[in-house]
């Protein structure tokens, strides 16, 4: 009895001792951006510390989730990012600069040593990682960040989950305030095109298809001098993958005009590509706008009525009969489809489709005689030899994507200059007449940006349901929060439960979707971490 009383008294004494805790709070923000497999540093966590009393950050303890494939992780690092400028106080930033550039040629794969000091690195980690810091703190805001590097060969569908278990300041556990959501899954990606690749300043405007052989073909603008639109030195580039997007072959140029007609390359730009696979023949078509001359001014304003290449943009095709390996000389179809009164005719960038009856369809857009843009479609009934256009679907719309939602029924999903949400229209006669879809201008938020839409039939996916799959920046202002959404009712509703945020960061916003196999959707898009980023997502990660 006496022993029990002594033990109880000791327990009460220990409980009365205050927990030793650091005076300063550390704010933690976990990222939701692609983890590029080829990148040496991917930002996993940002740490913001207002050092009012603390002198030293001793260490950070990180826990990796139980389902993480540890054998795929090369290393985890702790970096110190310095201090905050006084004029930035109150902005609650988590970094003074971009530690890893997405736009500076040659500097997109690793942390810029000018902006960070590496304090610790743990290779081949276990489930718990201790990152030693021993970093002297300066009065005011101090920044730290945690980097993740994956091994080559990491699966594109792998995911990493992690949380900060503890951070020690001056030998005491710090109070952590996590400002990001719980349960974030970090998804893998591949930077198909980085700034500076092949001596090009920028890569923009993705299109993506899967051939009958399972080959992925990604097209895009190769913008050599800057990221600006035509007219400029721009070619249409293509990257080809035969392993589901893990690796990509050397870039090809399906369309490039060089110094055609005695004008410099900067006045022979061709771009904003759209690509389709003729599923009946496996022929592949790329369509793009070619601008000849125009004095390096923006083609949107410099293309004029008429048909002559010196005054109006030309609509050109390239064809591949060998699964995207080689490409034909340019085929000019301007005379077939352009009204001479229009200022500018071009495709809807991204992709086209083959209908169930074999008709080839590309989305289009044109600036009419009153200088108002309008979205529509063009189609071919003879395998791409001849093309026709009828009427626009909705006025004051531009970049669109088309999907066959029922046999012979096409849905056109359009960028609308009015802003706020996507415009959607239906045609049953290849664009001769259009009706507004019930979801138009209310179901899909947009900030006036290109988007992607594909239809996947029940027999072609693991869910066994007819799917409409959509991607865009899920916001009405700015371009960020790139998201994949799935509709199970033909696009009438897009449930939040069937959406997956891929990239919260600011980016150019364009994307294109294509099925990799029955279980997996692929997306090529302009992300916050690389100009052309590819990710693979299991359908069951979206429809659970």
Curated annotation (Swiss-Prot):
One of its GO terms (biological process) is oligosaccharide catabolic process. It holds the Pfam family BNR_3. The active site is at residue 399. SUPFAM superfamilies: Sialidases (SSF50939). GO terms for molecular function: exo-alpha-sialidase activity. Keywords: Glycosidase, Hydrolase, Periplasm, Repeat, Signal. It catalyses: Hydrolysis of alpha-(2->3)-, alpha-(2->6)-, alpha-(2->8)- glycosidic linkages of terminal sialic acid residues in oligosaccharides, glycoproteins, glycolipids, colominic acid and synthetic substrates. Its EC number is 3.2.1.18. Its main location: periplasm. BNR repeats lie at residues 239-250, 318-329, 378-389, 425-436, 485-496. Coiled coil: none annotated. The keyword Signal applies. It comes from the Bacteria. The keyword Transferase does not apply. It is found in: Periplasm. GO terms for cellular component: cytoplasm; intracellular membrane-bounded organelle; membrane; periplasmic space. Substrate binds at residues 415, 479. InterPro entries: Sialidase, Sialidase_fam, Sialidase_N, Sialidase_sf, Sialidase_trypan. Residues 1-22 form the signal peptide. Belongs to the glycosyl hydrolase 33 family. PANTHER family: EXO-ALPHA-SIALIDASE (PTHR10628:SF30), SIALIDASE (PTHR10628). Sialidases have been suggested to be pathogenic factors in microbial infections. This is Sialidase. The gene is nanH.
């Amino acid at each position: 009895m006496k022993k029990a009383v002594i033990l109880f008294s000791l327990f009460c004494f220990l409980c009365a001792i205050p927990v030793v805790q650091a005076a300063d709070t550390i704010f933690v923000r976990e990222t939701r951006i692609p983890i590029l497999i080829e990148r040496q540093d991917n930002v996993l966590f940002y740490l913001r510390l207002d050092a009012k009393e603390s002198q030293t950050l001793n260490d950070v303890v990180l826990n990796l989730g139980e389902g993480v494939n540890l054998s795929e992780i090369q290393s985890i690092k702790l970096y110190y990012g310095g201090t905050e400028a006084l004029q930035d106080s109150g902005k609650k930033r988590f970094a003074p600069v971009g530690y890893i550039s997405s736009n500076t040629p040659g500097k997109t794969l690793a942390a810029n040593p000018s902006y960070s000091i590496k304090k610790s690195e743990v290779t081949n980690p276990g489930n718990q990682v201790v990152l030693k810091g021993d970093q002297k703190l300066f009065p005011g805001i101090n920044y730290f960040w945690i980097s993740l590097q994956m091994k080559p060969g990491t699966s594109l569908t792998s995911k990493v989950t992690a949380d900060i278990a503890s951070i020690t300041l001056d030998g005491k556990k710090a109070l952590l305030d996590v400002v990001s959501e719980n349960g974030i899954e970090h998804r893998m990606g591949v930077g198909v095109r980085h700034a500076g690749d092949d001596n090009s300043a920028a890569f923009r405007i993705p299109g993506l298809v899967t051939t009958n052989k399972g080959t992925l073909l990604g097209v895009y603008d190769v913008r050599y001098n800057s990221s600006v639109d035509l007219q400029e030195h721009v070619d249409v580039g293509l990257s080809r993958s035969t392993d589901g997007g893990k690796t990509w072959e050397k870039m090809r140029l399906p369309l490039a005009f060089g110094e055609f007609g005695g004008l410099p390359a900067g006045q022979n730009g061709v771009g904003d590509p759209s690509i389709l696979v003729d599923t009946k023949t496996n022929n592949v078509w790329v369509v793009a706008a070619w601008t000849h001359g125009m004095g390096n001014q923006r083609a949107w304003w410099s293309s004029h009525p008429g048909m002559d290449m010196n005054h109006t943009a030309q609509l050109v095709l390239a064809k591949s009969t060998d699964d995207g390996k080689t490409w034909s000389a340019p085929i000019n179809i301007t005379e077939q489809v352009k009204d001479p009164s229009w200022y500018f005719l071009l495709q809807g960038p991204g992709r086209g489709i083959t209908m169930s009856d074999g008709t080839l369809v590309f989305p289009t857009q044109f600036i009419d005689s009153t200088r108002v843009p309008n979205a529509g479609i063009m189609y071919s009934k003879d395998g791409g030899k001849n093309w026709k256009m009828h009427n626009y679907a909705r006025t004051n719309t531009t970049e669109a994507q088309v999907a066959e939602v029922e046999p012979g029924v096409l849905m056109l999903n359009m960028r609308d200059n009015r802003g706020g949400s996507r415009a959607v229209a239906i045609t049953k006669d290849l664009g001769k007449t259009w009706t507004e879809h019930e979801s138009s201008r209310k179901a899909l938020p947009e900030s006036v940006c290109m988007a992607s839409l594909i239809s996947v039939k029940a027999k072609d996916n693991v869910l066994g349901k007819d799917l409409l799959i959509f991607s865009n920046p899920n916001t009405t202002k700015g371009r960020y929060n790139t998201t994949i959404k799935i509709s199970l009712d033909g696009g009438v509703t897009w449930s939040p439960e069937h959406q997956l945020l891929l990239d919260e960061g600011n980016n150019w916003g364009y994307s294109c979707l294509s099925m990799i196999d029955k279980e997996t959707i692929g997306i090529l898009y302009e992300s916050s971490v690389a100009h052309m980023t590819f990710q693979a997502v299991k359908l069951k990660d979206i429809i659970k």
